[in-house]
A protein has these predicted regions:
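Rossmann-fold dinucleotide-binding core
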Residues: 4-86
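Helical "substrate-binding/catalytic lid" subdomain
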Residues: 57, 77-174
Length: 175
């Protein structure tokens, strides 16, 4: 069983699965979410696409890496789920940046705004992650560099185009 944790396009995952199958090998696309902290703590979310029997065999190992390991469907489904996750990450990251820019321009301390948002309906994981980075302007030490998100949003943009979907917020976030 080959397990791939890359975030790539769905076609790449399916091509890898087909090539592996020709060699008699199972391939699971199993992208992860949760960052370095999730990896260190064994709390990653792992979204898996592929054969159910192969998933059941690999689960013993995947379960040591992640607290939330789910078979999403056939080959490509794990990758698709990761892209869906990244769609929300991208949009929420842009929304948080704009919210904190507005707070700053209104004379509101970023940390105070973040403290209130964490107990309000406007809360999001990305807002909570972005607040200290924005407050200190320490963008170099972000756990997930913008270039990774930019790559993922580009894949999402291409997928939406290929599927004939109009994902306006995704397109605006990518810009």
């Amino acid at each position: 069983i080959v397990v791939d944790h890359s975030t790539v396009d769905i076609a790449t995952s399916r091509t890898c699965a087909e090539a592996a199958e020709l060699k008699g090998v199972h391939f699971l696309d199993a992208p992860i979410s949760g960052g370095p902290g999730g990896a260190a703590g064994g709390t990653l979310a792992i979204m898996v696409g592929g054969n159910e029997d192969a998933f059941e065999t690999a689960y013993e190992y995947l379960g040591k890496m992640g607290a939330n390991v789910k078979l999403m469907g056939p080959s490509g489904a794990g990758t698709a789920m990761k892209l869906i996750n990244q769609l929300l990450v991208g949009i929420n990251t842009v929304a948080a940046a704009e919210a904190f820019a507005l707070a700053n321009s209104a004379g509101i301390d970023i940390t105070a705004a973040a403290d209130l948002l964490t107990v309000s309906w406007g809360n999001s994981v990305m807002a909570a992650r972005s607040a200290p980075i924005t407050a200190t302007r320490d963008f170099a030490n972000s756990a997930a560099p913008v270039r990774n998100l930019d790559k993922d949003m580009g894949i999402i943009k291409d997928l939406a185009r290929d599927e004939g979907l109009s994902l306006e917020l995704a397109l605006k976030s990518y810009e």
